[in-house]
Amino acid sequence: MSYIAPIIPENAPFTAAQRAWLNGWLAAYLGPAGAANAPASSIAPAAAPEAVEDFPWHDPSVALDERLRLAEGRAPARLLMAAMAQLDCGQCGYLCETYAEALASGAEKSLTRCVPGGKETARVLKELIEAPPVATRPASRQPSPPPGAEREGPAAQRREGEVGAGARGTAPARFDRALKLNRDGSEKDTRHVVFRLDRSDLAYEVGDSFGVHAANCPELVEAVIERLGGRGGDDVDCPDGTRCSLREALTLVCDIARPSDEAVEVLASRAPDQDESQRLQALAEGYPGAQPEDADLLDLLLAFPSARPPVQELVSALGVLQPRLYSIASSPKMVRGEVHLTVAAVRYEKHGRRRKGVASTFLAERAAPGAAVPAFIRRAHDFRLPPDHDAPIIMIGPGTGVAPFRAFLQERRAVGARGRNWLFFGDQHRASDFLYEAEFAAYHRDGLLAQLDLAFSRDQRERVYVQHRMRERSAELWSWLAEGAHLFICGAQAMARDVDAALAAIIARQGKMSLGAAKTYLATLARQQRYQRDVY
């Protein structure tokens, strides 16, 4: 039976604004996820809940230096956690907390798994691990065992929450197609990617992510081999402990888009030109202003021509190519035997060369229909539809952030959920960038989408984003929250930060409370799993 939060009656001695605020507070405190906070009706006292450690640094909007300050005095694993990107994106094969615990325990050796944090995070992790131990205050609970600790080598580990078997904790998924979603005139190339799962043991739920082990661009690989003076067919020992040809290593195993500091140090040590060697060393040590910034391996080989390391030495120093995660855009109840993704193909100019995103262009350009691609499912523990099918949901997902909400709507339709659905979507131009327009328009017409608000930033002189549409609908948003609505955000970190600020301002204004109280209200919703984010 669904839980219905109490509502302040209209004849109660409160103003309309006071009633709205109280209704919202009651819905947040006593709603479906918060009912456990209500006073127990049993005479016997409830057992005291186990203390849960707070992580004040676990916020991607907080700067790295401030995150480290907030973790001062904590156990080493907590300091390591504070150095990470705080996105819990799973690209490292862990969550931020469990990756830090694995590093602290020694079960994980690689410092470069935090893809969003990049070299900045890796360098801080290295400093923290190499620093002498200092007195810390203990964690309030024992750290969870690092996932896959019983396996030897990070490449062989199977991470907690992954579904899949075989090499690198994966199972083969058959690539089917990558249809372009943008129309003519768009500046973007967004693909609707479909994998067939009928010959694999991969199974997913809405809210999960799909991990893809992509291959590096063949043209980039051949250019690197040529600059190194190597032979693609020669066998090398790979950084993941395997042995294969140089071409295969640079294509499937090594991260050549983001050379590790260790690889840059190898180049520095093998550059007879003193100026080049010093500049490479500055890059490896992360000195501000060291050039070229954000260079891939070919950039470095072109910029520092005297650096000619032995091929095996360089390959051993490169990092392992990490999988890329994509929010799943389908419900298995609606598209049996398939998984759908929404992928923005990344292409840009850098250092005088055309650059490509590793996984996005692999899916958009190079994956062949029917090809088996190593893949896995990353379980979502904190991005799930409410179990109460009558609960309303508000989804905010511009651009490719709309992917999980396409899945949510398919799921709600499949299970016959009666709760109202509200989608905020935005992109550049309506004529060319309204992703899944026909589907969402049909859902709006037939009532599955009770509300559909659109923000196309470049269709008018002033830029308009989803947070502007949210402010225009402030009163109704507050009303939905007062009725127990669940909030979901998916998309880029900067967008999520702006939306979070807009939500706090809306709640403060409509609820007649301070901004600080509004942020506390949002934090309460998050604790009750009524405010969930999938941010990258």
State where each predicted segment sits.
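Aromatic- and Gly/Pro-enriched helix-to-coil junctions and flexible linker segments
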Residues: 20-29, 34
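Local cysteine-cluster metal-coordination motifs and their immediate loop/turn environment
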Residues: 84-102, 111-127
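Short, charged low-complexity linear segments at domain edges
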Residues: 57-78, 120-121, 125
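C-terminal accessory/binding modules appended to enzymatic or scaffolding proteins
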Residues: 67-79, 83-88, 174-176
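Amphipathic alpha-helical packing elements
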Residues: 80-87, 99, 204-205, 210, ...
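Short beta-alpha connecting loops at secondary-structure transitions
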Residues: 65-67, 84, 107-111, 423-426, ...
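FNR-like FAD-binding dehydrogenase module
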Residues: 2-10, 14, 31-61, 123-536
